[in-house]
């Protein structure tokens, strides 16, 4: 039974996504369906967590819009996410960046990772 579930899961996995981690700034292109129309909406922010594995893997992106913090959680392997663009790589020491919720302004800024 487990082998059957693994084969169904592996068929649903996407391979066209970039390797991103918490701390990275990403631009997520999301398909939004309004009535009978659909359009692509961009959500740009910092990845504050990546959780789960396989088909059930999700990631949460946080941005500040009009001085209000907005967090949105996306499944990694969903067809609703058109594409994920990696804007910058962040240099952080934690896997879950929940402490960014309390920080404001310059304190909430993440150092950019230097490629060497």
From Swiss-Prot:
UniProt cross-references to Gene3D superfamilies, sorted A to Z: 2.30.30.790
UniProt-listed GO biological process terms: translation
InterPro entries reported for this sequence: Ribosomal_bL19, Ribosomal_bL19_CS, Ribosomal_bL19_sf, Translation_prot_SH3-like_sf
GO CC annotations, alphabetized: cytosolic large ribosomal subunit
One MF term in the entry's GO annotations: structural constituent of ribosome
Region forming the signal peptide: none
Keyword entries, A-Z: Ribonucleoprotein, Ribosomal protein
Family designation: Belongs to the bacterial ribosomal protein bL19 family.
Chain's role: This protein is located at the 30S-50S ribosomal subunit interface and may play a role in the structure and function of the aminoacyl-tRNA binding site.
Entry-linked NCBIfam families: rplS_bact (TIGR01024)
Protein's UniProt name: Large ribosomal subunit protein bL19
Annotated source species: Streptomyces avermitilis (strain ATCC 31267 / DSM 46492 / JCM 5070 / NBRC 14893 / NCIMB 12804 / NRRL 8165 / MA-4680)
Originating gene: rplS
């Amino acid at each position: 039974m487990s082998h059957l579930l693994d084969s169904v899961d592996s068929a649903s996995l996407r391979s066209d996504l970039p390797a991103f981690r918490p701390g990275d700034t990403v631009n997520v292109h999301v398909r939004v369906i309004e009535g009978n129309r659909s359009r692509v909406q961009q959500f740009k922010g910092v990845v504050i967590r990546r959780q789960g594995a396989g088909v059930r893997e999700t990631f949460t992106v946080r941005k500040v819009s009009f001085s209000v913090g907005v967090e949105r959680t996306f499944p990694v392997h969903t067809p609703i996410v058109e594409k994920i663009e990696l804007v910058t790589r962040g240099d952080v020491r934690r896997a879950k960046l929940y402490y960014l919720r309390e920080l404001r302004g310059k304190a909430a800024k993440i150092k950019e990772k230097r490629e060497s």
